[in-house]
Amino acid sequence: MSEETKALNFIEHIIEEDLTNGLSKENLRFRFPPEPNGYLHIGHTKAIGVSFGLGEKYNAPVNLRFDDTNPAKEEQEYVDAIKRDIAWLGYKWESELYSSDYFQKLYDWAILMIKDSKAYVDSQSSDAMREQKGTPTEGGTNSPYRNRTVEDNLELFKGMKDGKFKAGEHVLRAKIDMSDPNMLMRDPLMYRVMYAHHHRTGDDWCIYPMYDWTHGESDYIEQISHSLCSLEFKPHRKLYNWFRDNIYEYAKNQLPLPPKQREFARLNLSYTIMSKRKLLRLVEEVVVTGWDDPRMPTISGLRRRGYTPNSIRQFIEKVGVAKRENVIDVSLLEFCIREDLNKSANRVMAVLEPIKVVITNYPEGKEEWLDAENNPEDENTGSRKVPFSREIYIEKADFKEEAGNKFFRLKLGGEVRLKNAYIIEANYVVKDAEGNVTEIHCTYSTDTEKRVKGTLHWVSVKHAITAEIREYNRLFIDEAPDSHKDKDLMEFINPNSLKTRMGYLEPSLSSAEIGDRFQFQRLGYFNVDNDSKPGALVFNKTVGLRDSWAKQKPKPQQNQQQKQPHQKRKAISVIQQLGKKYTNLPEEKQQKVKIEIQSLAKDVAYNELEALFGTAMKKAGTRVAVLIALKEHFKNGLERNENIDAFILKAKEDKNDVLVAEANEID
């Protein structure tokens, strides 16, 4: 999709308006300002994607600035991890900067604020200041120290800097308005005394600037044009502007561009918590093995689980930039990694719950090395050799002694195709003393052209290598584990979030290296974990081939009854039904419906879509659904024709914004 045809989000509209009103494109500059007090998580990727994405779109510099103003919680370990994660995602920053770079400049400006009676030293306790703050409906009370003389304030503030006072004895506050309806404007703190070793400045400072004072002024020093942050900071904008406007008077000759703060909805994900404090609790209480545990929503955890940078960037693009808070279904993130790995991951065979198959008419001691395609989505990946012998393993779940006509896997008297090999028929079984099947004795046929309905994966017993398999599931069983005020989030920990077993793998995997990703055919996507050692591979399950979580969730009986006829309808009919209300759905619901339409599109013939090209103008939702399905056909090689071009052009000229945006996504 070209930049010319892609619809602008509301932040891009703001930037375009600023450019139209005289802002030079050369003055565009953005930043990502993490606090180095923890590891980046999936929630941060939206802020990263927004700022760095704008940098890429406008060819503008993006600073990586560490907001390191609280030495009690910040460490170099987190700085290094943040840099590693952003680089892994594929983004490049213009300059690596730190708020601590500006400590002297901020201090000098604070002195000027005191001299202009815009700041004062308060000597009350934090409790007293809190009581004087007032409420959202009632104004606050002025501090008894609010009218200290400039001389006294300067002397006290310098004494704070020189370490003459205890922590909490004095603070510096901005002098604004204790009756302002916005409580953040009621004489906010600018500095506090803190005796803590800073990871960069050491013990040079014992006063540290507060977030609201540091944030905007750092933007101003760096000449950031657009300071982008999440919606929770929208009430802070008034204070951001107050500090900015006052400092601008001191420095406008050297720093001519005042920054602009704008807010967007942060990323909230179902079955996930985003609080660094609560994630730290999971680590400290050994619910997980560390910040990079594959069940953690940290970028390092996702990377270790097997997520790719491209899948996360695609996820952020699909989520989009919105003004309203919402919760994104984690299944969208899983969809993105499936889609990415489907294109890039080589197919291999692995058996996780084995049962032995003996092919009685295959010569003992004989072995063959059969050709197997690496990835049908990418012919450039070529093929590999897979060993076949008289004894193989298949999955226990792929065999039943007795089964109905709808069971297309192996059963007594039934035939299945072995992937890349022969067709076998189950003749009889061997059982142990408890009556459990231990072996299935089969015969094979070299007539591989025969039509059979089931195809199974397998590995040769003689050639299989073993590996530890870690199957991960969601860490929480509740969609919103952090939303229950009366319950501890630990009550919602999924006791089955990790299952470890030994698996049997085809021998080509013996050379797999840490980080390599594969599709274990019919099982899911897996990657080689960091814990792997030569001869002792460990694989993490990244995601299944389809969303199995939905099957595990208990559903009301009524919903189950309603779903049966829906599943039996033709795919094109379901797409039409999904499209009916599409344009009236909220963004999150639209995305879920879109994914469903994309999945159904493979079962729809082009002529079925073409029949809907004449859909009435007022049925915009149906036309959107047709466009979504068409795009899936384009991916599979459908060529454009006059009818398609006319349909797309008509959609681009429509009055419905959703329809126009969907049409504009097609080159």
Task: Describe each model-derived feature in a short phrase.
Residues 68-70, 76, 98, 112-279, ...:
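Active-site cores that bind ATP or allylic diphosphates and position pyrophosphate for catalysis
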Residues 22, 51, 82, 113, ...:
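Residue-level signal for inorganic ion chemistry
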Residues 78-102, 110, 117-119:
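A glycine-rich helix N-cap at a beta->alpha junction
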Residues 568-667:
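Non-catalytic all-alpha helical scaffold/repeat segments
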Residues 254-336:
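Long, charged, mostly alpha-helical binding arms that flank functional sites
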Residues 33-36, 65-73, 95-104, 127, ...:
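Conserved short loop/turn motifs at secondary-structure junctions
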Residues 6-15, 20-83, 199-230:
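N-terminal catalytic cores of NTP/NDP-binding nucleotidyl/phosphoryl-transfer enzymes
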Residues 237, 243, 317-319, 327-572:
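Core subunits and conserved enzymes of cellular information-processing
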